[in-house]
């Protein structure tokens, strides 16, 4: 049975009345965005909109992006990545649970020195996935070329952001490569393992 989106009480400043709002809207008021599912076009549009809004509201304050995601669409994830790099607000990324595939890529995309993970988090990197389905050989060839182009791009960005040699990234992403939070710190995907909420 679906749980639905939890609601929490909220009192407008200067008001004596409480109203109930969904938890994600309440977190956004604290400049917290939660990526807690597969990365899809719809989710990416929502996260991009939140990033742009929070940056326009006050670009000197950090935005916290909490990640617990199995990954998902590369193009949707790249929309989030590009927006994170585009805005002026520092983006603090925090992994809790799992950051896999595009989730790990976005974790690594946070502001340098501000990429964090909770102690029991798991991080997994791998190469982009593609499917052939029932299509003509020429279409499969076009898709294969695009997947190889994306793979090269993602590997280069990850090498730049982790400090790892490109050859190591290429080797490690050839198959699913799981890491603990501490291993991800040593690898350069994150900067710190934390047990308490950052101030």
From Swiss-Prot:
Keyword terms of this UniProt record: Cytoplasm, Hydrolase, Protease, Serine protease
Stored PROSITE patterns: CLP_PROTEASE_HIS, CLP_PROTEASE_SER
InterPro entries: ClpP, ClpP/crotonase-like_dom_sf, ClpP/TepA, ClpP_His_AS, ClpP_Ser_AS
MF (Gene Ontology): ATP-dependent peptidase activity; ATPase binding; serine-type endopeptidase activity
HAMAP family, sorted: ClpP
GO cellular component term of the entry, any: endopeptidase Clp complex
Source domain of life: Bacteria
Gene3D superfamilies registered for this protein in UniProt: 2-enoyl-CoA Hydratase, Chain A, domain 1 (3.90.226.10)
Active site: 101 (nucleophile), 126
Catalytic activity: Hydrolysis of proteins to small peptides in the presence of ATP and magnesium. alpha-casein is the usual test substrate. In the absence of ATP, only oligopeptides shorter than five residues are hydrolyzed (such as succinyl-Leu-Tyr-|-NHMec, and Leu-Tyr-Leu-|-Tyr-Trp, in which cleavage of the -Tyr-|-Leu- and -Tyr-|-Trp bonds also occurs)
GO BP term (any one): protein quality control for misfolded or incompletely synthesized proteins
Function of the molecule: Cleaves peptides in various proteins in a process that requires ATP hydrolysis. Has a chymotrypsin-like activity. Plays a major role in the degradation of misfolded proteins.
Family named by the database record: Belongs to the peptidase S14 family.
Principal subcellular localisation of the protein: cytoplasm
Protein name as it appears in the record: ATP-dependent Clp protease proteolytic subunit 3
The keyword Lipid biosynthesis appears for this protein: no
Quaternary state and interactors: Fourteen ClpP subunits assemble into 2 heptameric rings which stack back to back to give a disk-like structure with a central cavity, resembling the structure of eukaryotic proteasomes.
Organismal lineage: Bacteria, Bacillati, Cyanobacteriota, Cyanophyceae, Synechococcales
Record-listed E.C. numbers: 3.4.21.92
Annotated Pfam families: CLP_protease (PF00574)
SUPFAM superfamilies named among the record's database cross-references: ClpP/crotonase
Species this protein is from: Synechococcus elongatus (strain ATCC 33912 / PCC 7942 / FACHB-805)
CDD domains to which the protein is assigned, alphabetical: S14_ClpP_2
């Amino acid at each position: 049975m679906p749980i639905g989106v939890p609601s929490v009480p909220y009192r407008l400043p200067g008001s004596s009345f409480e109203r109930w709002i969904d938890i994600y809207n309440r977190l956004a008021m604290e400049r917290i965005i939660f990526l807690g599912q597969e990365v899809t076009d719809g989710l990416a549009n929502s996260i991009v909109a939140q990033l742009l809004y929070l940056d326009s509201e006050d670009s000197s304050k950090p935005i916290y992006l909490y990640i617990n995601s199995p990954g998902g669409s590369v193009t949707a994830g790249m929309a989030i990545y590009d927006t994170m790099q585009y805005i002026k607000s520092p983006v603090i990324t925090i992994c809790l649970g799992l950051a896999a595939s595009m989730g790990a890529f976005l974790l690594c995309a946070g502001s340098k020195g501000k990429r964090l993970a909770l102690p029991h988090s798991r991080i997994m990197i791998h190469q982009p996935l593609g499917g052939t389905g029932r299509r003509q050989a020429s279409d499969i060839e076009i898709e294969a070329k695009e997947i190889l182009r994306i793979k090269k791009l993602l590997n280069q960005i990850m090498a730049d952001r982790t400090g790892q040699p490109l050859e190591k990234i290429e080797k490690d992403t050839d198959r699913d490569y799981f890491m603990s939070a501490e291993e991800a710190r040593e690898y350069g995907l994150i900067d710190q393992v934390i047990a308490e909420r950052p101030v």
